[in-house]
Amino acid sequence: MLIISLTIIASLFYVLATSHVLSRLFHQQGPSQKVTVILSTVAIVAHMLLLVNSVFRSDGQDLSIVNVSLLTCWVIVVSVTAVSLKFPATLLLPVVYGFGALLTIASLFIPHHILLQSINIEVGLVTHISLSLLAYCILIIATLYGVQFYFIDKRLKRKDLAIVHSHLPPLMVVERQLYQLLNLGTILLTFA
């Protein structure tokens, strides 16, 4: 019952955060960062508690594909939300929060119980898995930045004046962040 409640809370607040950002996406001042952070923080905390309660069970760890997907989604949501506090990432937020809502709701309907009695902890294996997961998340975020770059570039080439007066980041900033993320993801994947 706790897992169902946490899933509903996380999904609801992801949907609220998504709709808040989408409602003011092309407004000159953009969505209120304070409201977005509050809504997304509640969703992120509920998502984290959902992960803790669904992965760590009394009879072992449940590392099914659904739980690993939920973990990956959580890392991406936390990363993009943290980045959006410093850099404008308004186009990425609805996509990330929307997928977070869909994945948490889908986890209720997809059977996923693969219990491991114990995990053999070797430093090399844990390092490999952690670096690979982190690189995967960073490269997914870089992909989202690539989509954002394409969207802004397309609007600029059409000479859409609405984008000039919007709160969206300059194209060069998005390009620089994209290359930084690609380099970081590639380096982490190489070390993994």
Where are these regions (language model features)?
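A mid-sequence, solvent-exposed acidic-amphipathic segment
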Residues: 155-192
